[in-house]
Design a protein with these regions (language model features):
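Membrane-interfacial and juxtamembrane segments of integral membrane proteins
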Residues: 2-170
Length: 170
């Protein structure tokens, strides 16, 4: 029976990831499968970051609107606040899309994870768009079973991962 090159555990033939150390059996440089807890942390960050950005947009807009009203030009202050808030939103979107092109999300990047295809190459922009925007909708449709699937799947794949043949690695 073959053994894992990282932990020397016996592994069945034909599988890609070690069930003990979660290392890649074909190419050790790809990394290990990310834990479900770490993936949950990244998902939370992927929601918290835009929420904080939205709060900042509202704060900046309100601040400039208030300053404009105090100076007698309420519309000018509101317009400046709206412009700055919009600029912040665009900056976040550009940052997120650049990370998508590298096969990661803001939360995964901050926690040191990335999304790879079966051969270990980065998932890429198109794959990430389908995975994040279509696959995650599917994963969440039936009581979030597609996300919970990660806990029981040997390769720690959710339905959104299976849809585009991706793995989340550290």
């Amino acid at each position: 029976m073959p053994t894992c090159p990282s932990c020397n555990a016996e592994v069945p033939a034909g599988i890609r990831w070690c069930g003990i150390c979660h290392g890649n059996l074909i190419d050790r440089n790809i990394g290990r499968l990310a834990s479900p807890g770490k993936r949950l942390g990244a998902s939370i960050l992927d929601w918290v970051i835009p929420f904080v950005a939205l709060l900042l947009i509202m704060l900046v807009g309100g601040l400039f609107s208030g300053l404009g009203a105090a100076a007698g030009g309420e519309q000018a202050g509101g317009a400046i606040g709206l412009f700055l808030g919009f600029a912040l939103l665009i900056a976040y979107i550009v940052w997120a899309f650049k990370l998508f092109a590298r096969g990661t999300t803001p939360g995964k990047k901050l926690l040191g994870m990335r999304v790879v295809k079966e051969g270990g190459q980065p998932a890429g922009f198109g794959t990430m768009l389908v995975r994040e925007w279509i696959g995650k909708v599917i994963s969440g449709m039936v009581f979030s079973l597609g996300f919970l699937w990660i806990l029981f799947d040997r390769d720690r794949q959710g339905w959104h991962d299976k849809l585009v043949s991706t793995y989340v690695v550290e």
